[in-house]
Structures are given as C-alpha cells and as structure tokens.
UniProtKB/Swiss-Prot annotation:
InterPro entries: AGPR_AS, AGPR_type-1, NAD(P)-bd_dom_sf, NAGSA_dehydrogenase, Semialdehyde_DH_NAD-bd. It comes from the Archaea. One of its GO terms (cellular component) is cytoplasm. Catalyzes the NADPH-dependent reduction of N-acetyl-5-glutamyl phosphate to yield N-acetyl-L-glutamate 5-semialdehyde. Its main location: cytoplasm. Belongs to the NAGSA dehydrogenase family. Type 1 subfamily. It catalyses: N-acetyl-L-glutamate 5-semialdehyde + phosphate + NADP(+) = N-acetyl-L-glutamyl 5-phosphate + NADPH + H(+). One of its GO terms (molecular function) is NADP+ binding. This is N-acetyl-gamma-glutamyl-phosphate reductase. The active site is at residue 149. Pfam families: Semialdhyde_dh, Semialdhyde_dhC_1. GO terms for biological process: L-arginine biosynthetic process.
C-alpha cells in the first residue's frame, strides 16, 4: 500500500481527492494539510467522507514540505503557492501531482504574463499531465502539472482534428462552467443571487486558460494556431460544456469525423465518443469521463464539436489520480471507474 499526502485539503479539489481516493485499493491517505484548520478532525470539515477509508482517524496538519515522507503528494494549493512547495518535494524524490497552474508552462514568461506572478521554482522535468496526449512522458516523470479544467475539455474536443491537420488555423472555444470552478471561497460573482437563473461570460478574451489550450494544440499541430476562448458561468454546481468551432480544410462527412475520433481515442477508457445524441453535464457528473459529440458540419464547412467533463474530476482531482495511477504503474482506472450521477 502506497502512502498519499494532500497539501491543501480544504478546497474543492482536496475534497474530491478524498472522495475518490476512498475507493482506491492501492493507496492510503496519511497526511492532509491545512494551516487554518490544523488540529481539527478531517471528517468534521469534510463530513461527506465520514466512515470512509481511514478518514475518521485523520486530523488536518500544518506540516512543512520537507517533513512530508509519503510516496505521492497531491498539491492542491492556489496558483503561486505550489512553486514554494513542489521544488522541495521534487528534491526529495517524491512523486508530485500539482493541481495549480504553476508548472503547466515550459515558457516561464508566458506563465508570468498570464498569471501576474513571478515564478520562483522552475522544474525542467515537469510534465503536462493530460494522459491522452502525454502518457509516455507522464510514466517517466515524478512531477506532473495537472491540466486546468477548461483546457482539458477544450483540448480533448479538438485534438483529433488538429493532430490530423483537418481544420484551419483558427479555432474558437465557447465553454460554460459550474460555479465550483471558481473555488471554495465565496465572492460576489458566485453569490447565489447573482448566479441563480443567470448566465454570463467573464474574462472574454483574457482568461489564463487561453494560452494553455493554445500551447497544447500547437504542440499537436506542430505550428502556430489562433485559438480563441471565452468562458461563461452557469447556475449549476459542477461541469463544463465546451462547444468548439473551426473550418475544415477538406470536404469530409460527419461519419468520417466520428471515425477519426474513434481511432484517435480507441485505447482511451475515459473518452466516450457520441455517434448519436449530445454530451451532457449530468452524464459526466462525479466521473472522470470526457464525453465528446456533436460532429456537425454546416454548409460553409464549419465543424462543431461538443465536450462535457466534470470540472472537479476529469478537470482536476480525477485526472490527478489518473496521473498518479500512470506514474505508479497502477491500473489507470483504479478509483475512477464510476458512472455519471444522472439524474
């Protein structure tokens, strides 16, 4: 049994890690850190995991990175905080999956420009942890930068077309997310009275996930692409629905496109291709699946692809566990093989 520590255990991603890891047969959580809640019973703060695994016996700890001695560490801290923690764990040879944006960019200037932070802990060997694109690199790395939630749904929705050079260099993503994507801290934006019965775009051209989507698709295309991304906030708790648009370079049918997607993702358990019907948020809620469908082409050659993920699972904690499974040589589905909560 391998041991796991969670640094930053009071947020939504920490909560989801606990829920999902309670079903994992190969690991045991031994440390959950929180400076604010240190000394308090874990299950008093997270009653939803009471009586699961060994959680009734755990208390939050305020433990320094250099004092952590477990096989795997999930770093579920805010952007900017991880870079002060991960290098220490890296030097100790501990397997680290970082859920912040601190290690998603090889280009530090790009990170600093979009996040408005000075990066202080560069690790050249860190790998972008999107298994469907980088599985072999993930296997060989001990430091994984878990992808952002919006980029996960966006990249996976268009990767087969981009990799096969079937679309023009302009791609537009329109994504709609539940409010849990904004984190556990309350704000005016996520206040019930402002979100309920409402929908609205935000950071319409300047969301920090834009360059993350762009760099990964450019990696696949091996050329520059013009990627546009606009997020919207939905009055729901979980899920991201992404609608991707581009123009085909050649005259192919929706059936051809579906075959291309099925071939590209043929070995990917967590990718479900919809030949008919449409992906939905309820279909993926609570799961590590990314559902992809739509595949419609209009009279101008515009192709539209739709993807759905749970932003807290495939968009965060579930994908982090998938990455851990790959690093440790576990069954990739371990702890993650559940269906959607529908209705």
């Amino acid at each position: 049994m391998k041991t796991v520590s969670i640094i930053g255990g009071t947020g939504y991603t920490g909560s989801e890690l606990l829920r999902l890891l309670s079903n994992h047969d190969e690991v045991e959580v031994v440390n959950v850190t929180s400076r604010k809640e240190a000394g308090k019973n874990l299950t008093d703060y997270h009653p939803q995991v009471r009586n699961l695994s060994n959680y009734n016996d755990l208390k939050f700890q305020n433990i320094a990175p250099e004092d952590i001695d477990s096989d795997i560490v999930f770093c579920a801290t805010p952007h900017g905080a991880s870079m002060a923690i991960v290098p220490t764990l890296h030097e100790k040879g501990i397997n680290v999956i970082d859920l912040s944006g601190d290690y998603r960019f090889e280009d530090i200037d790009m990170y600093e420009s979009w996040y408005g932070l000075k990066h202080s802990g560069k690790i050249d060997s860190a790998v972008y942890g999107l298994p469907e694109l980088h599985r072999e690199k993930i296997k060989k790395s001990k430091t994984i930068a878990n992808p952002g939630c919006y980029p996960t749904g966006a990249i996976l929705s268009m990767a087969p077309l981009v990799a096969n050079d079937l679309v023009e260099d302009r791609i537009i993503f329109d994504s709609k997310s539940g409010v849990s994507g904004a984190g556990v801290e309350a704000s005016q934006t996520t206040h019930f009275a402002n979100v309920n019965e409402n929908i609205g775009p935000y950071k319409i051209t300047k969301h920090r996930h834009s360059p993350e989507i762009g760099k990964e698709l450019q990696y696949l295309a091996n050329k520059n692409l013009k990627v546009s991304f606009t997020p919207h906030l939905l009055p729901v708790t979980r899920g991201i629905l992404t609608t991707a648009h581009s123009f085909l370079k050649e005259d192919i049918s929706p059936i051809d496109v579906i075959e291309i997607y099925e071939e590209f993702y043929k070995d990917e358990f967590f990718i479900r291709i919809f030949e008919e019907g449409m992906p939905s948020l309820t279909g993926v809620r609570g799961t590590n699946f990314c559902d992809i469908g739509g595949f419609e082409i209009d009279q101008y050659g515009r192709i539209v692809v739709v993807s759905a993920i749970d932003n807290l699972v495939k968009g965060a904690s579930g994908q982090a566990i998938q990455n851990m499974n790959i690093i440790m040589g576990f069954d990739e589905k371990e702890g993650l093989g559940v269906g959607g909560l529908k209705p």
